[in-house]
Structure formats: C-alpha cells, structure tokens
C-alpha cells in the first residue's frame, strides 16, 4: 500500500492535465475573483507556458459567461462582453454607440474602439425596435440596478428591411458589486430572448436569471441561484413592444427576487435545522434563531442596490 502511495506521489501530471486543472479553477472563480485565482495559480504552477495557455483559453469564456463590463477608451461608454455581442474572438459590438470594442481578455480591458460597419449593424427597421427596447430597459435598470448595465442585441434577422420576416432581440442585464475588503462579492445576470414572430404576430419571451454571492470571511459560503422564465405578448409598434417587454421583464425579475427572500427566510426553521448535528463537534450550539442575520439574498440586494 505504501509503495502504491509513493508511486502516486511521484507521478507527474502531464502538460495537458495541468492546463485543464488550471482552466477549471479559472472558470469556477466567483464573480470578480478570477484575478485572485490567477495570481495563486501562477505561483502554484510554476510553469509560465501552462499558465499562459490556460489563461488564454479560460479568460474569454469566463468574461463572456459573467458578462463583464469594460470601459471603452476616451469616454466612449461601456461595452458588455457577451456571446451575443461577439463579432470575433476579441471584438464586441456595442449597438448603443454603434462601436466595436477590441478587448484584451486576460487583462480584462478594452484596448481600443472602431466604428461598426454596416454589415455589423442591424437594418433601420430592426434598429427601430432595438432602440426603443434599449431605451425602456435602460430606464428599468437605472431604477432597479444602480450598479447595473444593459444592452439589447439583434441575434437573428438583423438585415430584415421591413415587416414580413421574423427576428430576435436579446436583452442583457448585468450587475456586479465587488467588496473584497469586506470579504464579499455579488453578481446578477439576466438574459431575455425575444422572438418577434411576424406571421402569428406574437412575441415569444424566454428569460434566464442567475444570482451569485460569495462570502469568505473566516469561511467560504457561496450562493448560485438560477431560474428560467417564459412569457409572451403581441407584436405591436416598436414603442408599444418595448414597453410591454420591459414590463414583463420587470415583473418576473421582481417576483424572482421576492421568492429568493422568502426561500432564504425559511432556512433557520427548515433547511439549516435538518442539516445540523444535535450538538456540533465544537460542543457549542449554533444560534439558529439568529440565522437571518446571515441572509444571502438580503446582502446581495444590499450590495447590488436592488429594490431601491
């Protein structure tokens, strides 16, 4: 048995194994913490080549998954890095300003911008709907997510010149509050796909919400809550569609946040008590009656400025 253990200890991981393990750590870093993970990985690996290759492969995926916001040079605004705005590996469209941001994924900065060309922008007909929806979503986000950013992209049918064809818009809402000095970080991400169906005159709306929080003061507690939604409304004018869609998004997101608050308010009397020992190994009883003070959802709401 000892010989087997010695053999395992002496087994050297291959280059690819090291890279895949490093990528796993990169991709599973909580919101806003990938650079802390990168610093530790670099020290642990002691192999610049493995580290660089893992980082080059993992950072773009992480940035798009977390929909990070980067400031564009010269005060041109901010761009959300996402798969919906991706033109190529390092270029991302900001439809609001009709600019393309060139991104350094590993450094997480926007190095420069260029004007978007006609092929990268939607037609005037599609832009009318995109612009109206973008304005309504901006208004909603400014009211509900003081730390939030939003974008509306056309992902299907962007070249349609008028009624008669289907097209699809995607609403992206992302909010992040980083407070590492207080040992806590939080994020909110929501993606809403709106399929404009011309023949049936119906808008099919599908949403995905994800809330994350990480607390690491004298411990490690992480929240990762997800929820899918489906709804619909009628195909109307651009302005009327925008108002209807924004109201649907507002309704579902507000209800979801309320449901999280209710679910976590029940933790002291249900889930926590079912998990606990009769008497912990510390021989000290945990104050179950006061566990609401550790409410994750309340802290996420506070950190992101939700509900204000």
Curated annotation (Swiss-Prot):
The keyword Transmembrane helix does not apply. Coiled coil: none annotated. GO terms for cellular component: F-actin capping protein complex. GO terms for molecular function: actin binding. One of its GO terms (biological process) is barbed-end actin filament capping. Transmembrane segments: none annotated. It holds the Pfam family F-actin_cap_A. The keyword Magnesium does not apply. Keywords: Actin capping, Actin-binding. It comes from the Eukaryota. Signal peptide: none annotated. F-actin-capping proteins bind in a Ca(2+)-independent manner to the fast growing ends of actin filaments (barbed end) thereby blocking the exchange of subunits at these ends. Unlike other capping proteins (such as gelsolin and severin), these proteins do not sever actin filaments. Belongs to the F-actin-capping protein alpha subunit family. Component of the F-actin capping complex, composed of a heterodimer of an alpha and a beta subunit. This is F-actin-capping protein subunit alpha.
């Amino acid at each position: 048995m000892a010989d087997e253990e010695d053999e395992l200890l002496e087994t050297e991981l291959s280059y690819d194994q090291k890279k895949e393990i490093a990528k796993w750590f990169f991709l599973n870093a909580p919101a806003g913490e990938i650079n802390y993970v990168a610093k530790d990985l670099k020290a642990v690996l002691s192999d610049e080549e493995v580290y660089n290759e893992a980082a080059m492969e993992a950072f773009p995926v992480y940035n798009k998954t977390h929909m990070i916001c980067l400031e564009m040079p010269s005060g041109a605004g901010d761009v959300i890095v996402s798969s919906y705005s991706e033109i190529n590996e390092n270029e991302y469209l900001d439809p609001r300003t009709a600019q393309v941001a060139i991104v350094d994924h590993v450094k997480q900065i926007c190095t420069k911008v260029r004007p978007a060309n006609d092929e990268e922008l939607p037609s005037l007909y599609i832009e009318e709907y995109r612009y109206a929806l973008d304005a309504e979503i901006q208004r909603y986000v400014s009211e509900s997510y003081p730390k939030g950013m939003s974008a509306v992209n056309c992902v299907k049918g962007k070249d349609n010149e008028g009624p008669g064809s289907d097209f699809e818009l995607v609403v992206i809402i992302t909010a992040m509050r980083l407070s590492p000095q207080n040992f806590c970080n939080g994020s909110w991400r929501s993606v809403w796909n709106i399929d404009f169906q011309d023949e049936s005159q119906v808008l099919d709306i599908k949403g995905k919400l994800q809330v994350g929080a990480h607390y690491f003061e004298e411990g490690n507690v992480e929240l990762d809550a997800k929820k899918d939604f489906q709804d619909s409304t009628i195909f109307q004018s651009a302005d009327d569609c925008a108002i209807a869609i924004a109201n649907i998004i507002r309704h579902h997101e507000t209800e979801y946040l309320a449901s999280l608050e209710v679910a976590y308010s029940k933790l002291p009397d249900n889930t926590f008590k079912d998990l606990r020992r009769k008497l912990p190994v510390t021989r000290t009883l945990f104050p179950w009656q006061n566990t609401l003070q550790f409410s994750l959802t309340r802290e996420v709401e506070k950190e992101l400025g939700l509900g204000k």
